[in-house]
């Protein structure tokens, strides 16, 4: 594997000289890009805490997970093709189109009247978000030289990580405290603010992009124009990778959410179909004139390492986002609001980690050593998190999260920068998009793997802890509801289960009481006795569930720790490449040969 940027050997030559952005135009474009990324990344996690209220309003509990899955499917399938098309035809109008689609999807999601409508509109919203996520980091690479990119990629990485971390807290706050609007937003429909909040911010960003983002910021000079260029688009490759990814995500979602068993024909069949489609995609890419995902990029050691690290980073980050709040609320017994406040220091530490890494890289023009340090700090933090028990203090948990966040933050600064520095500018879109695609895929893989570990551990451990006779007294169905982790984090669900189980037991107990002069008193006495017995039994079941959940999440954190160990190994291959200080050679006109200095970094 080479550490130098791959040579193009391609009929398309280097990009035209871009108009450099300065002053108001530069500030406006950067602000718009940050707002776009913030909203589109935020919507990956902001809906989770609002889902109970949404399901309560729209019904359709059986489709609970699809509200999140639809967004992921829409976004991840768009990244590869849009990244490639932006290299061929420019970025501005793709970015504006994606932002518009995202805002339309947000408005429609907020106005949804049924769960099916919400799922469809979330998919539309995801399509727009996928376009934005694919292009925002790429446009930053267009604007700045690699030597300048370090601090800006750090800032944008912080925005992306901050959005993912703060999403659950913001979603919960909007659902509980969003403003009321007479006739439109009531106490039971405050959840609509989760989607409507995107509109004013997104419109400002859209206007700034329309006015200040140059159309020639990244357009490639090419001998192919018009329909000739369109005919070279790899539509079969785009269809194959989208289909393969959808099948993969569906299989992982079905298995990890226990919709179907991992060994079921449905899961095995769709995962096998995904594997077959990926094989066809890789074969197709070897012969495509303009491949959606040029496989030769992965022969570059630095680019391949950055892409794999993006996959691993999101596996770790998203799994922590999902399961740390569950531990804090379900095991340590704090509220959702307090849980969000406790995770805030982790968010701040990730910002500090990213900022420090950005400053160090900007000054040294090197990223290898700081990335190794970041991986070690992150691993130490996750190791400490994996030692938490039901008796762990909140302060201790917060300290452990701060350490993990500090290490994770380093990766927000490094990965896009390293990948972009390792490839020619004419491949900036498809290269950056590949890194983002693997990152999005990593988020799904991480949750699927850790979720399976947590669910399997919980199912086996709870059996050992249940009080004797619990299954007989509560019935299998009642026990299933009583051992659902939602019991520990949702007081309304817990009250419903207690009421239902008590009512069922009382009715069975009094069904055969013979009539007589003391009938009413007997019924009252039996009701009081059975109620006390059932509630005592349920309190024991809930405590057993709390202890089992602690063990299950601990095992899940050990799985995340394994991801961290792999990250350390891959980081060793992320070697330094001298960063370009200026674009003198890279701004050669279209007549420049494809193997010119455009492919070579300029040493600082």
Question: Where in this protein do the model-derived segments appear?
Answer:
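Helix-loop-helix hairpins in multi-pass membrane proteins, especially solute transporters
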Residues: 83-238, 348
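Alpha-helical transmembrane segments of multi-pass secondary-active solute transporters
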Residues: 64-65, 94, 152, 194-197, ...
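Interfacial helix-cap and linker-helix signal at transmembrane-aqueous boundaries
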Residues: 54-55, 85-86, 170-187, 252, ...
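Small-residue-rich alpha-helical segments with characteristic i,i+4
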Residues: 137, 153, 159-160, 176-179, ...
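Membrane-embedded alpha-helical segments of multi-pass transporters/permeases
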Residues: 107-111, 206-211, 279-282, 383-386, ...
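Transmembrane core module of solute transporters
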Residues: 24-79, 83, 117, 233-236, ...
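Transmembrane-helix exit segments and adjacent C-terminal regions of multi-pass membrane proteins
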Residues: 1-29, 33, 208-218, 280-283, ...
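Short, Lys/Arg-enriched, Gly/Pro-containing loop segments at transmembrane-helix junctions
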Residues: 218-224, 290-296, 463-465, 578-589
């Amino acid at each position: 594997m080479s550490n130098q940027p791959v040579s193009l050997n391609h009929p398309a030559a280097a990009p035209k000289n871009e108009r450099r952005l300065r002053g108001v135009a530069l500030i406006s474009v950067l602000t718009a890009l940050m707002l776009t990324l913030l909203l589109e990344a935020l919507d990956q996690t902001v809906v989770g805490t609002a889902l109970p209220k949404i399901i309560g309003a729209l019904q359709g509990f059986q489709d609970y997970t699809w509200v999140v899955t639809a967004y992921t499917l829409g976004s991840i399938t768009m990244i590869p093709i849009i990244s490639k098309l932006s290299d061929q035809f420019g970025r501005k109008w793709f970015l504006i189109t994606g932002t518009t689609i995202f805002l339309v999807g947000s408005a429609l999601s907020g106005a949804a009247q049924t769960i099916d409508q919400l799922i469809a509109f979330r998919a539309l919203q995801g399509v727009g978000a996928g376009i934005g996520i694919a292009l925002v980091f790429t446009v930053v690479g267009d604007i700045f030289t690699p030597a300048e990119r370090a601090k800006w990629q750090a800032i944008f990485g912080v925005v992306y990580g901050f959005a993912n971390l703060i999403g659950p807290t913001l979603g919960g706050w909007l659902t509980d405290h969003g403003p009321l609007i007479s006739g439109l937003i009531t106490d039971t429909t405050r959840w609509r603010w989760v989607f409507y909040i995107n509109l004013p911010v997104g419109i400002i960003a859209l206007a700034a992009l329309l006015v200040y983002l140059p159309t020639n910021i990244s357009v490639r000079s090419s001998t192919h124009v018009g329909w000739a260029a369109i005919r070279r688009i790899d539509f079969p490759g785009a269809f194959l990778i989208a289909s393969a990814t959808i099948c993969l995500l569906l299989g992982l979602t079905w298995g990890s959410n226990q919709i179907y068993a991992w060994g079921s024909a449905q899961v095995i069949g769709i995962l096998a179909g995904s594997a077959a489609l990926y094989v066809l995609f890789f074969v197709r890419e070897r012969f495509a004139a303009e491949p959606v995902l040029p496989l030769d990029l992965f022969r570059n050691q630095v680019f391949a390492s950055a892409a794999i690290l993006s996959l691993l980073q999101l596996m770790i980050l998203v799994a922590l986002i999902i399961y740390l709040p569950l531990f804090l609320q379900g095991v340590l017994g704090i509220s959702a609001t307090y849980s969000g406040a406790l995770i805030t220091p982790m968010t701040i530490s990730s910002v500090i980690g990213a900022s420090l890494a950005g400053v160090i890289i900007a000054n040294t023009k090197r990223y290898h050593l700081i990335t190794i340090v970041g991986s070690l700090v992150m691993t130490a933090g996750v190791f400490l998190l994996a030692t938490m028990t039901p008796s762990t203090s909140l302060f201790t948990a917060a300290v452990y999260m701060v350490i993990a966040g500090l290490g994770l933050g380093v990766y927000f600064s490094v990965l896009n920068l390293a990948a972009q520095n390792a490839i020619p500018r004419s491949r900036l879109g498809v290269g950056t998009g590949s890194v983002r695609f693997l990152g999005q895929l990593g988020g799904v893989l991480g949750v699927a793997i850790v979720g399976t570990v947590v669910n399997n551990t919980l199912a086996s451990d709870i059996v050992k802890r249940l009080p004797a006779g619990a299954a007989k007294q509560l019935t299998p169905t009642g026990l299933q509801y009583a051992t659902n982790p939602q019991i520990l984090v949702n007081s309304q669900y817990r009250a419903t289960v207690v009421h239902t189980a008590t009512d069922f037991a009382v009715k069975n107990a009094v069904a055969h009481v013979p009539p007589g002069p003391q009938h009413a008193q007997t019924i009252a006495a039996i009701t009081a006795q059975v109620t006390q017995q059932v509630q005592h039994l349920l309190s024991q079941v809930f405590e057993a569930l709390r202890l089992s959940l602690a063990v299950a999440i601990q095992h899940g954190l050990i799985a995340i720790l394994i991801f961290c160990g792999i990250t350390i190994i891959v980081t060793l291959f992320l070697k330094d490449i001298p960063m370009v200080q200026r674009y003198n050679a890279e701004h050669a006109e279209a007549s420049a040969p494809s193997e010119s200095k455009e492919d070579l970094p300029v040493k600082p």
